[in-house]
Design a protein with these regions (language model features):
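C-terminal accessory module of base-excision DNA glycosylases/AP lyases that mediates lesion recognition
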Residues: 1-41, 106, 121-138, 145-230
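Structure-specific DNA junction-binding interface
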Residues: 1-98
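Non-catalytic, well-ordered alpha-helical scaffold segments
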Residues: 53-61, 73, 77, 103-110, ...
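Short, hydrophobic/amphipathic alpha-helical patches that form generic packing surfaces
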Residues: 57-66, 110-114, 159, 217-225
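Short amphipathic alpha-helical interaction patches enriched in hydrophobic/aromatic residues
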Residues: 62, 95, 99, 161, ...
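Short alpha-helix boundary/capping elements
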Residues: 63-71, 83-84, 117, 165, ...
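Alpha-helical ds-nucleic-acid-binding substructure associated with the helix-hairpin-helix region
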Residues: 76-147
């Protein structure tokens, strides 16, 4: 696909992309949650506490890694009633036939849940305590208490709770960068240094197109799936 065709796709999908980005910001300010309904990921009203909704989103990012946003969302829906108290074994039983990594990811979720529950500060206050969002991402990606979250997943989580400006450098995005001649290789980054270097190229590419990093991510994914995901 030529750059001109990519920009034309953006022109046609700009309204949908803008709506999804607004929903990411609304997630932190309104009583809402994500769900998979009628073959679509939707934002719907929720009675859950703020920290419960934030942890749901963290679990989603753990589950979506190396699978898909839709599989991750369907699995969160299956786990929602037990996410805050169930054992890994109970979660594994619940997601058989729905999810791919039925043993390891529940362990990551429970490990992270236990760590966050033992902190002296609520999850939402912990996130707000970082004045520098780069330091916040470093904390999430490098913290042994939070399993299944690296730089890609931390960037995904922060974007989805309204903290933008990062690149979510999964294999599809990196492959797209290579296809458009932005990088010499389609190999995903394997260290913090590589991630930051590739992220800088991504951000500069978005700026050259006249769109935000968040818009470009959703645009590239819509090119692959035909949908505006999360």
């Amino acid at each position: 696909m030529e750059i001109s065709a990519l920009l034309e796709r953006h022109r046609h999908s700009r309204q949908q992309i803008g709506k999804r980005l607004l929903e990411f910001r609304e997630f932190s300010s309104k009583q809402v949650m994500w769900t998979y309904e009628q073959d679509e990921i939707k934002l719907v009203p929720s009675s859950c506490k703020h920290d419960e909704r934030l942890f749901e989103e963290l679990a989603f990012c753990i589950l979506a890694a190396n699978t898909s946003a839709e599989m991750g969302m369907k699995t969160v829906d299956r786990l929602r009633k037990m996410l805050h108290h169930a054992s890994p074994k109970q979660m594994t039983t619940a997601i058989k036939g729905v999810y791919r990594f039925i043993n390891l990811r529940p362990q990551y979720i429970v490990h992270s849940r236990t760590y966050l529950q033992q902190l002296d500060v609520p999850f939402h206050e912990l996130l707000r305590s970082f004045e520098d969002k780069q330091e916040l991402r470093d904390f999430l990606a490098n913290n042994a208490g939070i399993k299944g979250i690296g730089y890609k997943e931390a960037s995904h989580f922060l974007r989805n709770v309204g903290i933008g400006g990062f690149a979510i450098l999964d294999k599809h995005i990196v492959k797209s960068m290579h296809e458009f001649g932005i990088t010499p290789t389609s190999k995903p980054p394997s260290s913090r240094r590589q991630y930051l270097e590739l992220e800088q190229r991504y951000v500069e590419w978005a700026e050259s197109l006249g769109i935000s990093p968040e818009e470009l991510d959703l645009l590239l994914w819509s090119r692959k799936t035909g949908k505006i995901l999360k």
